[in-house]
Regions:
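Extracytoplasmic ligand-binding site segments that recognize negatively charged/polar headgroups
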Residues: 2-152
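Mature extracytoplasmic/periplasmic domains
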Residues: 198-276
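Sec/Tat-exported extracytoplasmic proteins
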Residues: 64, 84, 93, 106-110, ...
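Non-transmembrane alpha-helical segments in soluble domains
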Residues: 78-81, 103, 129-133, 152, ...
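Conserved C-terminal helix/tail region of periplasmic/extracytoplasmic solute-binding proteins
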Residues: 265-310
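Loop/turn elements at helix/coil->beta-strand transitions in domains of secreted/extracellular proteins
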Residues: 28-30, 85-88, 137-140, 157-161, ...
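Extracytoplasmic/periplasmic substrate-binding proteins
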Residues: 140-203, 247
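A bilobed periplasmic-binding-protein/Venus flytrap-type ligand-binding module shared by bacterial periplasmic
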Residues: 59-67, 105, 193-206, 225-226
């Protein structure tokens, strides 16, 4: 991996800078390096468990034109459980992700306090799901969505005005003319990080081709493509070389778009003058509340979550 030294410190060391917080849950660095006993840890070794690639810092989105929505008040995860937004809230129907959106909301609203928000106990899962099921019965949640495309359709159809929303949906909604924004929660973002692994059975030319593929992901071009839907890549400067100055300024540097910008398909999605919520990459990466994590009690969580969405 000749470009390993260019991979962002966010994944190689755990934070983007000395003043940044690592966040609760399984920060990628904690399971990145393979040790001599085959365990995974943050201690650097010559072996990695995966090649860190695409990542982002998620929050919730809102339609600025929806009745009763005030952008000035959308600064806390607590808004997802705000009685004033009764019947307008959507949550992603993926327990390993949606649980963090609602846990951050419950804690920010002062309704619950968790020992470790990245790894809830059975009792904490029960208490949180009981609260959510009650809110659902009262009509607080308007819907639960399964895919980014479905979320886009639901917000376009005015099924919800506030809720879980990912960057591809934000880009697609902006392309449709919806005045949607992602919140910048004071509590921090829910972060996630993808990566690529190799099968231990690869040999010869197959293994060489697999390494060529991994290195291609670090070449910069793939990162430029995913940047146009709001995602970040672990080799920041490589990506910069494949974006126009205007694209780099908007997607990574946090500046206002100096011209209309395309999505990955080439269709205009970002209009001139727009500013990305949360600002620059380094600012967003410094404000992580929790990482997407498969909790110790994941199986129990899935069963309880099913009661919520059924």
């Amino acid at each position: 991996m000749p470009l390993w030294g260019e991979v962002s410190g966010l994944t190689r060391t755990g934070t983007i800078g000395p003043s940044a917080r690592i966040g609760h849950g399984d920060a990628p660095v904690t399971k990145l390096y393979v040790q001599a006993d085959q365990s995974l840890s943050a201690y650097p070794s010559r072996w990695i468990s995966m090649l860190p690639t695409v990542h982002n810092f998620d929050s919730f989105g809102f339609d600025e034109d929806a009745p009763g929505i005030s952008a000035q008040r959308m600064t806390s995860w607590a808004r997802l459980l705000d009685p004033a937004l009764h019947g307008q809230v959507a949550i992603v129907n993926e327990p390993a992700i949606g649980i963090f959106d609602v846990a951050l909301a419950a804690e920010a609203a002062g309704l619950m306090q968790f020992r470790d928000i990245g790894n809830l106990t059975v009792g904490e899962i029960d208490a949180l799901l009981s609260l959510l099921i009650l809110k659902k019965r009262e009509g607080h949640f308007s819907c639960f969505w399964n895919t980014a495309a479905e979320a886009t359709e639901m917000m376009t159809a005015k099924r919800f005005s506030v809720g879980s929303l990912w960057s591809p949906s934000v880009t697609a909604l902006k392309r449709k003319g919806v005045r949607v924004r992602q919140a910048v929660p004071s509590e921090g973002y829910r972060a996630w990080h993808g990566g690529l692994c190799l099968s231990r059975r690869l040999e010869g030319r197959q293994r060489d081709a697999a390494y060529e593929y991994l290195n291609w992901w670090l070449s910069g071009w793939p990162g430029a493509v995913v940047a146009r839907q709001g995602y970040y890549m672990s080799v920041v400067e490589r990506v910069r070389a494949h974006l126009t100055p205007a694209e780099w300024a908007y997607w990574y540097a946090g500046h206002a778009a100096s011209e209309d910008l395309p999505d990955p398909d080439g269709t205009t999605a970002i209009v001139r003058g727009s500013v990305r919520s949360g600002g620059a990459y380094w600012s967003r990466a410094s404000n992580i509340a929790v990482w997407n994590t498969t909790m110790d009690e994941h199986n129990y969580l899935v069963r309880r979550w099913g009661e919520l969405v059924d």
